[in-house]
């Protein structure tokens, strides 16, 4: 996180978003989705990629903190791609409301809001590091994060996101 926070506008944005996510949020009513129900959303067949780690997950309930996570890792030569689906009952999503439409590009990185299907997303790519992230808000409840290293652009992240059945994931928010 130090590497990211030390850089200009993106660092300021991340610091503000980190602050917001630490503040008590209004949880979405409903049951926490168990990680076993989230694993199919990260278990993908990606053309040109092989699975590096078998999909895994965790569900945790402790007092006022509830969270489920499913994740999987892929590789293609020196390139890596990690996919995570998180259910925090909506407590991690206030930052998406702050970014209805944003675009920033510098000599070091690109940051912009986009749509992945019907869902709001924040896309970031660091040119020198060849590191990209795609963070998607699904039904104002689930946080889908795709992160890649060794990438020439964010196209592999977008292609992987397009293979995820995000509309089906949204139905679990009920």
Q: What do these predicted ranges mean?
A:
Residues 11-21:
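Bacterial N-terminal signal peptides
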Residues 28-131:
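Short, solvent-exposed recognition patches
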Residues 148-174:
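Surface-exposed amphipathic alpha-helical segments
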């Amino acid at each position: 996180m130090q590497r990211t926070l030390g850089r200009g506008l993106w660092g300021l944005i991340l610091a503000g978003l980190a602050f917001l996510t630490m503040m008590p949020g209004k949880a979405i009513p409903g049951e926490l989705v168990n990680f076993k129900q989230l694993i199919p959303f990260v278990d993908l067949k990606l053309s040109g990629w092989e699975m590096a780690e078998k999909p895994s997950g965790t569900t945790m309930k402790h007092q006022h903190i509830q969270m489920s996570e499913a994740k999987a890792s892929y590789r293609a030569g020196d390139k890596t791609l990690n996919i995570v689906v998180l259910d925090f009952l909506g407590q991690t999503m206030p930052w998406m409301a702050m970014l209805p439409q944003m675009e920033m590009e510098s000599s070091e990185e690109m940051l912009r809001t986009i749509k992945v299907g019907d869902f709001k997303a924040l896309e970031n790519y660091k040119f020198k590091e060849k590191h990209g992230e795609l963070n998607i808000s699904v039904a104002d409840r689930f946080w889908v994060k795709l992160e890649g290293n060794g990438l020439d652009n964010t196209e592999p992240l977008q292609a992987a996101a397009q293979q995820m059945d995000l509309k089906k994931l949204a139905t679990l928010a009920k």
